[in-house]
Design a protein with these regions (language model features):
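N-terminal leader/targeting segments and the immediately adjacent pre-domain N-terminus
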Residues: 1-71, 96-99, 194, 198
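Solvent-exposed, acidic/flexible segments
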Residues: 4-7, 52-53, 75-82, 99, ...
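Surface-exposed intrinsically disordered loops and tails
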Residues: 26-45, 158-171, 224-241
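Active-site-adjacent loops and short helices of periplasmic peptidoglycan-processing enzymes
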Residues: 45-55, 79, 92-136
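Active-site SXXK
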Residues: 63, 77-102, 132, 188-192, ...
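A generic structural motif
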Residues: 72-73, 265
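Penicillin-binding protein/beta-lactamase superfamily catalytic region
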Residues: 176-178, 202, 222-266
């Protein structure tokens, strides 16, 4: 069991640690700490933004809900947690034989000429799936009007200083340098789309979310300019976050189901 007083202290800490971000990012037309410090046109919002609610959360212990606060059924934007969904989808691609190994170069895996063109340069042809997953790809290029340079020198976490963010730096060999770069993460999403040849939200719903009993309230939004031709059909590539809008909008309950799946190793 839990110490009720300590449990209540933890819940109160969560309730009192609400973000200072505006409730309506669409009205603000920027993402604090990201697009508000980026120059035009790199800072342009490309995907939908949804007004947020207050703090909500769950404490799950041994598969049971031990505590909850706020409204865990409310659907909110959830930013970089989308990267975890990319990881699981990559695992499914390996399981289905679409990727031989995460150590395989992406360039040798993709059959779509348009998508594979992003990996043809000397800098990019040695990038593996693991590099994309670990954010060590050092990919160079522009995707959906966003250059990789926009996140050069980006810092994340408490105490981050981003005065150099977006300044050009010398690229390293893929696999040797880590950088939190959303353009490169979004490239992983496009590469997965070209493998599955289906919208990633459809694959996620069919292979993961429906089997674990998730609701039908979640959605995964792309950018206005992220539509691509896959075997003659227009499909929208989705991002691994909400840096420029879009991304996964989902409830706390559904996130918890997904988290429990990962905790139990699938």
């Amino acid at each position: 069991g839990f110490n009720e007083n300590l449990l209540n202290d933890a819940i109160n800490l969560a309730l009192n640690s609400e973000t200072l971000w505006p409730y309506d990012l669409g009205a603000a037309n920027n993402i604090p700490g990201l697009t508000d410090i980026e120059p035009e046109p790199w800072n342009r919002i490309l995907g939908p933004l949804k007004p947020r609610g207050g703090p909500s959360g769950l404490l799950v212990y041994k598969g049971y809900i031990a505590a909850k606060w706020g409204d865990p059924t409310r659907v909110d934007m959830t930013f970089s947690i989308a990267k975890s969904y990319f990881s699981v989808l990559t695992g499914i691609a390996v399981q289905d034989g679409l990727i031989d190994s995460v150590d395989t170069p992406v360039a040798t895996t993709l059959r779509d000429k348009t998508v594979s063109s992003y990996f043809r340069s000397d800098q990019n042809r040695g990038i593996t799936w693991e590099h994309l997953l670990h954010q060590t790809s050092e990919w160079e290029g522009t995707l959906f009007d966003k250059p990789d340079q926009v996140d050069h020198f980006r810092e994340v976490g408490p105490g981050s200083i981003n005065t150099r963010k977006g300044s050009k730096r010398k690229l390293q060999k893929p696999g040797t340098f880590w950088e939190y770069n959303d353009v490169r993460v979004n490239l992983l999403g496009l590469a997965l789309l070209s493998l599955f040849k289906r919208p990633l939200s459809d694959v996620l719903r069919e292979r993961v979310m429906a089997p674990i009993g998730a609701s039908d309230t979640w959605s995964w939004h792309g950018y206005e300019n992220s539509w691509v031709d896959i075997d003659g059909e227009q499909m929208q590539s989705v991002p691994g976050g909400t840096h420029w809008g879009g991304g996964i909008q989902i409830s706390t309950f559904d996130h918890a189901r997904f988290g429990l799946l990962v905790h139990r190793r699938g």
